[in-house]
Amino acid sequence: MSNDKHIAPLAVVSMGCVLPGVDHFRALDTIADWETVFQSASPLAWSETSRPIQGRQMDDSGFDFKKFSIPPLFRKAVSRETRLALRAAEDALAGLVLPESLRDCCDQFCAIHLGSDAAYRNATKVGALRALAEKLQAQGCPAAEVRRRLDDYKQPLAESLGCSSHDRVGEMASSIPARIAHFAHTRGKCQTLDGADKGGLRLLQLAQDCFRYHDSQMAVLTSVQCFHHRPQAYMLLEQGVSQDACWLEGAISLVVCPLAVAHEQGWPVLTQLGDIVTTHDGSPQPEADHPAALYFAGANQVFCQIVEMVLRQHQRCEGRSFTGGRWQVNVAQTQSLTPAVDDRVAIVDYQPITGHPLDKTQFWQTLEQGEDALREHSAAHVNAEAFVRTTQQKLSTYIHRTMSFPAHSPSDVALKKPMMPAKKQRLDVTQLYALNSCHSWSEKIRQFERVAIIIASNLSLSADRLQAMRALWSGLPGSEGAIPLPELPSINHWSWYGACGIGTAQLLAQYFGISADCYAVEAACASSLAAVHDAVRALQAGRYDAVIVGGIETATLERDLVLCSAQMMLSVSRIRPFSQGADGFTPGDGGGFVMLTHHPVPRAIATIEAISGSCDSYSMTAPDPLGQALAIKKTLSLTAIDAQTVQYLEAHGTGTELGDRSEVMSLKYSYHRDKHSPLYIGSAKYNFGHCFAGAGALSLCKVLSAFEHERIPPTPVSELNVDLPLGDIPAEVPQQAIPWRLSEDGQRKAAINAFGTGGINYHLVIRQSS
């Protein structure tokens, strides 16, 4: 399948704004109205007198939760970022009537930078409990006494900072577009990205790349930024962000589509956006009629400048990012990318990351033999007196084993390339594993001129959350003596890198010694395939020559165990996808990386044939088989491959009764086949646990390893759930490794599912290279 359609200008058919003093885009009648937004700055509430930061923050205390279908129980769990983004999207969509024919193809893409107030509250609750437990243990208190006093403290802590089963959903960046999709009744693809102050630009480029295909016909692009505390600001100042600019909170939504769609629907076009580009060095300075912006809006920077461009009736806007390089958005299209000759994208190399060493041979042996990485919590990983209880309780966990990395402390991870201690101790452990996993790719990636690095990750890493505790610690409820604040490294140049998902991509680019477009993606447990989707679309459009893409997350941290336990999502023993009595998943640390290119590669491992997605957010937590089936249908519509020739499906397979049933039901709509050629199904989560943002990448690595060994590994759960409608497909779950025979056309073909909270679904079809 080929597509010679070039990237076309975007039609902006509506805008929505929620900024200080501005509740609607229509309130910005003149450029004077815009200038008022940032000219009345004052020192931010948490700013130090010795280092004042001027800005304007948002007050959304009057947010209408009922309008956006948020139950009273969950209201404290919903982040400020989510509330602002919902208001901006509502403003943008208010004047548009979306026909039913566009709802399946209306994407919801968002941009943020660093963490949310919800994430910071959750981290502070867990951090305070661990600190109190360690204090009592150091005083020689018996274990039973420590548990009792911790349990007594959990109630006032929950009353102070909030505590509900929705806490994990509320802190997830991907909940923002999922909630917008729920409000707007759209079912297109869904994700949140972090491109730092180029986040808006990445959203626009993603929309351009997506509109070349019929599975995307319009998009609601929303960028949002809040500034929560002093350590967050100081990390940004260390990166060169101006202390003198007005730091501006808020959210902006742009509704964009191809010009043809705007004309078909009779929508007025506010402006076109043609060239949407970045440059890494040797860039010209802004001309006199385009001076540098007088405000810093974080993830909202590009969209703020586009609003200003429209109000000033200028033909372009531009800026310099604190991450390096310049960006520019032109109304006219003066540049054109050359699309890839073939839509198929080659996989050049891959590297799985699990709780085992970085060894592909051991990875395959674990898969083939049906083994796992299950281990007991260590005292360093989980403070049992603080958190582990025999039954489900508030701010606790009820599981004793996970599939974790051997170490969660950066100091305990040996690097393949030396690093300064002042840098290493400020990075996240996932970043160190990522650097080690891609260590051998330096020469290979340097062969390509235009490169991107896209990381599926939690967008707010542990360092960001731990620094936030400094700001919230004084507000902790009283206890028996002050709770000591955990020691943290002072903030320096490397603190920002270790705090955010985009920092992982930036570190890899520096490690390879290359200039690359970098950003991070979060789409709940579908994050990795969402990142692969972005990479594939960009390669197909001719935007890059190669992309390193993957995902990684430490899903076994104390805060994740506590938050997931509150949702009753975890298995009391171990994950058993599709089994009788499946009771949840086991968290695992890991993920994987792949190197992709659209150029002909003589030794490609496999080719990605098609990828697409959907978001059916009728429920923020319950899976929906029709929404999952829509993602599969859209993917298969982009390839000439007959679904009946796909031999193996790597399932999302979370091992929950509801999730397993929903997934199997979704498969019968597209993968129904002759009873003599069953679809084989498996899940890497049995072997390595659920790696959250890294899950889809690990699934992809499993399929690639199976291609290489020409065998389908087992998911040995022993007793399958007889109530699953496997026979309707028909499908089988191998209990031991079986040969992966060539199909009648001499090929091996597979598909991969990745589903996430909020109804976010992605599906990929892959073929082994000849």
Swiss-Prot record:
Keyword terms: Acyltransferase, Antibiotic biosynthesis, Transferase
* Active site, per annotation: 525, 652, 690
Tell me the residue numbers annotated for binding substrate: 652, 690
**A GO term, aspect molecular function:** fatty acid synthase activity
- This protein's pathway: Antibiotic biosynthesis; prodigiosin biosynthesis
The Ketosynthase family 3 (KS3) domain is annotated at: 342-768
The record's domain comment reads: It seems that PigJ is composed by an active ketosynthase (KS) domain and by a chain length factor (CLF) partner domain that potentially decarboxylates the malonyl group of PigH.
Q: What is the role of this chain?
A: Involved in the biosynthesis of 4-methoxy-2,2'-bipyrrole-5-carbaldehyde (MBC), one of the terminal products involved in the biosynthesis of the red antibiotic prodigiosin (Pig). Catalyzes the decarboxylation on the malonyl group attached to PigH to yield a C2 carbanion of acetyl-S-PigH. Then, the heterocyclic pyrrole group of PigG moves to the PigJ active site Cys-525 to generate a transient pyrrolyl-S-cysteinyl PigJ intermediate (acyl donor) whose pyrrolyl group is captured by the C2 carbanion of acetyl-S-PigH to yield the pyrrolyl-beta-ketoacyl-S-PigH.
User: What is this protein's record name?
Assistant: Beta-ketoacyl synthase PigJ
| Species this chain originates from | Serratia sp. (strain ATCC 39006)
